[in-house]
Amino acid sequence: MAMKGPGLFSDIGKRAKDLLTKDYTYDQKLTVSTVSSSGVGLTSTAVKKGGLYTLDVSSVYKYKSTLVDVKVDTESNISTTLTVFDVLPSTKLVTSVKLPDYNSGKVEMQYFHENASFATAVGMKPSPVVEFSGTAGAQGLAFGAEAGFDTATGKFTKYSAAIGVTKPDYHAAIVLADKGDTVKVSGVYHLDDKQKSSVVAELTRRLSTNENTLTVGGLYKVDPETAVKARLNNTGKLAALLQHEVKPKSVLTISGEFDTKALDRPPKFGLALALRP
């Protein structure tokens, strides 16, 4: 099912967030994906973080309008996600649980319309947390709100509101989050029609502490297989990333970060290799 309409609430401001944070890693990570003759996709991921190693194996199988995803890791956790498309017209039903924590289960229903979208999630436990979000808009303009309510305490766990604008050459968003305590303004501007070069900025202000965080960044696609990204915030943290498609669908990512205001501290480096058929 192709998503239509203004998208979910979580999509507002996502372009800026992804450009500033997606694919940056400071660990060593290897991901190998394969597809069996029966159509089952298998993905093994090994991560070295400091002196610790973790490993997880996930399998994905799609049958008609149903998608099953099961992941097992070295901590003996089993995560299962069942996604059913078009249970009702223009809907998506997602059920997830992470064992052995039976209370982690959640059921979410998403509905997509040409001018609106809604999502409701309910925890699978007595007195669960109920979450709701809605977005409405047209012609690249979207308004959204979300809230979470704990039925055990009778209190709201969160409430947020946002407005987003999406045009061919730019994306902008204003988000009021953390129960009204955080204001986040972000924008992405594409410098050319093919979106080979983009710049991004994000300003976050926490009202309770009068704390401001400004992050700027950019993306440049050297060629169809190679891209570089960089970001810098007002605290002096500078990060850069190089991503290269070594063969179709297989990507090597090298990233690093250092504190320009504390050059005596060692920089962080990360390497990730994703191999796909």
Curated annotation (Swiss-Prot):
GO molecular function, one term: porin activity
Cellular component per GO, a single term: mitochondrial outer membrane
Keyword entries, A-Z: Ion transport, Membrane, Mitochondrion, Mitochondrion outer membrane, Porin, Transmembrane, Transmembrane beta strand, Transport
Record's keyword annotation contains Transmembrane: yes
CDD domains (UniProt xref): Porin3_VDAC (cd07306)
Pfam families: Porin_3 (PF01459)
Keyword Nucleotidyltransferase: no
Compartment(s) where it occurs, according to its Swiss-Prot or TrEMBL record: Mitochondrion outer membrane
Similarity section: Belongs to the eukaryotic mitochondrial porin (TC 1.B.8.1) family.
Domain comment quoted from the record: Consists mainly of membrane-spanning sided beta-sheets.
Function: Forms a channel through the mitochondrial outer membrane that allows diffusion of small hydrophilic molecules. The channel adopts an open conformation at low or zero membrane potential and a closed conformation at potentials above 30-40 mV. The open state has a weak anion selectivity whereas the closed state is cation-selective.
Protein name per UniProt: Mitochondrial outer membrane protein porin 5
Protein's organism: Oryza sativa subsp. japonica (Rice)
